[in-house]
Design a protein with these regions (language model features):
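Nucleic-acid endonuclease domains
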Residues: 1-72, 77-166
Length: 166
């Protein structure tokens, strides 16, 4: 590769970085699909929720992610639309599930706070048959589940009020 070609590649890299920065300014969610699923949930979604709902406390627990005075133990399940499958759901380990669905194209959040006691209404699929009881997965895409979810939709403000026990 010639020195001129190396310089041109450096220019292109600089232009790409500049365009990516502009894209993220226009749509802060534009890069979310680049995260692995686990990293997206733990490194982006959970801190994003905590920043908007400070009454939650992050915990290092196997069965739930947050705790609060108003809601107790909350397990967060995050998806980037159009994907809507949630895995490793253990309704016996938490008081609520917070399904956080992020529309990366429209830069919108859709939050659903489902009491764990109502989780089985969604007819989830048993995820493991190796003796691990109470572990489920499900797609939130089905018409029946979308109808069920509507009653659990919350805004960040509503979520914060409930977490704070107000």
């Amino acid at each position: 590769m010639t020195a001129e070609q190396k310089n041109r590649i450096a220019e292109i890299d600089s232009q790409i970085a500049s365009l990516m920065k502009e894209k993220e300014t226009i749509n802060p969610y534009s890069n979310l699909k680049s995260f692995s699923n686990k990293n997206f949930g733990e490194a982006w979604s959970e801190p994003h929720i905590l920043a908007r709902c400070p009454s939650f406390t992050k915990v290092d627990s196997k069965g739930y992610d947050f705790i609060s005075d108003g809601l107790g133990k909350v397990e967060v399940k995050s998806c980037r639309l159009p994907a809507t499958t949630v895995n490793q759901c253990h309704p016996n380990d938490c008081d609520y599930f917070l399904f956080a669905l992020y529309d990366c194209d429209e830069c919108e959040d859709h939050l659903y706070l489902v009491p764990s006691e109502n989780f089985m209404e969604f007819s989830p699929t048993v995820q493991h048959d190796r003796g691990e009881s109470g572990c489920y997965s499900m797609s939130l895409k089905t018409k029946k589940r979308q109808e069920l979810l509507k009653q659990y939709k919350v805004s960040y403000d509503e979520l914060e009020l409930r977490a704070a026990n107000n």
